[in-house]
Amino acid sequence: NSGSEANDLAIRMAKKHSGNKSMMVLEHGYHGHTQAGIDISDYKFSNLKGEGQKNHIIKAEIPNEYDSQKSIKTGLSSAEKAIKQIKNSTDSIAAFIAETIVGCGGQVPLAPGYLKTIYPEIRKQGGVCISDEVQTGFGRLGSWFWGFEMHEVVPDIVVLGKPMGNGHPIGAVVTTAEIAHSFEQGVEFFSSFGGNPVSCAIGMAVLQTCLLYTSP
């Protein structure tokens, strides 16, 4: 019923599919208020009242588009630093999760070229690429329906939240058939009120409205 719960499920799916435990995240990122969400949210664990960075977390710098007028150089430079972190890690990575605009970091768009460079490196590790679209999805960026579209990449998992219901508490995880099948072999996902008909009706109405006003 929320982006937090959806991100929690995405983490479980990534770890089950990859067989790995480590997660790569961005500085100032926020992915929810569950324990698993806090563990991957620098915005939370680096807070003065936070629990600190866990051993299985690899934190990369934000490829900040505002840092340089030549933002493509910024994206590639940040990607190269992240790749070094990946190669220096003793553990293989389960997933890389990022928002395309880092909300709690100051609404910072990721610099061009970053995701196109980092995604293949994550996949070489057997990891999956997660796009957290809780704040950016469903046309909220104007020119793109999904944030990852402006970076010309295709994630392995996409996480959706309340914009799916125009603020109504609803969330979803979209992934490939291969990852979904891997997750079927693990502990069952269960939600007491999952698939609530009222929430589903609201979600469908929002989607139909989006399609009505975004179709050419």
Q: What is each stretch, according to the model?
A:
Residues 90-106:
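Short acidic, glycine-rich surface-loop motifs adjacent to enzyme active sites
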Residues 35, 149-182, 195-202:
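Active-site PLP attachment segment
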Residues 1-95:
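PLP-dependent aspartate aminotransferase-fold enzymes
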